[in-house]
């Protein structure tokens, strides 16, 4: 449910050429079926001319309600179409959870 909301909002606001939303909650100390830890890979030319912090702020603004109420952790990987073409291995893997709850 949360994953679908993330996908819909990012598609609507950024019109990405590529979008992947990955629920990484299983990598953390949370109950099975949780939707609390996500990784997003967004490729959109709307990021052109923006620094990394500006891109992340834009994603945070789009997902503000979800971040306030549902999402505990969000790994964000943003690219323009040109940057994505140069990216040989795609976005980096997320690290495994080091413990702690939530």
UniProtKB/Swiss-Prot annotation:
Region described as Disordered: spans on this chain: 83-102
GO biological process terms on file: DNA-templated transcription
GO molecular function: DNA binding
Domain of life assignment: Bacteria
Pfam families, per the entry: BolA (PF01722)
GO cellular component: cytosol
Metal-binding is among the record's keywords: no
InterPro entries referenced in this protein's UniProt entry, alphabetically: BolA, BolA-like_sf, BolA/IbaG_stress_morph_reg
Role description: Transcriptional regulator that plays an important role in general stress response.
NCBIfam families the record matches: PRK11628.1
Similarity comment: Belongs to the BolA/IbaG family.
Protein name: DNA-binding transcriptional regulator BolA
Organism: Vibrio alginolyticus
Higher taxonomy: Bacteria, Pseudomonadati, Pseudomonadota, Gammaproteobacteria, Vibrionales
Protein's gene: bolA
């Amino acid at each position: 449910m949360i994953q679908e909301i993330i996908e819909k909002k990012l598609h609507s606001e950024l019109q990405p050429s590529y979008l992947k939303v990955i629920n990484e909650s299983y990598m953390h100390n949370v109950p099975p079926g949780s939707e609390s830890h996500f990784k997003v890979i967004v490729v959109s030319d709307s990021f052109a001319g923006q620094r990394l912090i500006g891109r992340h702020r834009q994603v945070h603004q789009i997902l503000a309600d979800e971040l306030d109420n549902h999402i505990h952790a969000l790994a964000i990987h943003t690219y323009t179409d040109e940057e994505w073409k140069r990216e040989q291995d795609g976005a980096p893997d997320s690290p495994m959870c080091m413990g702690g709850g939530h």
